[in-house]
Amino acid sequence: MRLLWKFLAVVLVVSFFANGQESAGKVSKFDDAEYLHLTGADKKTATPIRGTLGFNNETKIVEFVDKKNVPAFSIKYDAIKSILYERTSTPRYVAALLVSPFFLFSHSKKHYLTIQYTDDAGTGQFVSIHLDKKNARDVVATAEAATGKKVEREEEK
């Protein structure tokens, strides 16, 4: 019995130190995100690119990689000016027409993260990412912790 307790104590100590080392150089990745790439001046012409949003604490870069592992953008933490989290809410008209009028009382919610930054030339730029509802809170918390910037929150009800 004592051997079992000693073994468990050693496993706990080793896992504690191993977790501490992983968090120092950790890359936080969030799947099921969509980068809304603007192709023109009109916001309606944005093409969604599905991929993974990542916060790399070693290189201090926010990056988005599409499904084919091609980087769509990478932003240095120092270049970030502000981060905005938005949650929008819209009625479900189609479901109300097709299924039941009671769907008018429920709303679909979408989550967006907008990062405003300056590029190498010093001009202001921004990127907008549509987040998955399952990990939107984790993305906001990670963005705040990794970059050191306060994330502004704007939520529609």
Map each language-model feature to its residues.
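Acidic, Ser/Thr- and proline-rich intrinsically disordered linker/docking segments
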Residues: 21-28, 79-157
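Generic structural detector for well-ordered beta-strands
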Residues: 54, 74-76, 128-130
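Bacterial N-terminal signal peptides
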Residues: 6-15
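N-terminal secretory signal peptides that target proteins for export/translocation
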Residues: 1-3
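Mid-length scaffold segments of soluble, non-membrane domains
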Residues: 58-89
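Short acidic, glycine-rich loop/turn motifs
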Residues: 42-43, 66-68, 117-121
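Anionic N-terminal interaction surfaces
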Residues: 19-59
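Short polybasic amphipathic segments
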Residues: 34-36, 60-64, 113-117
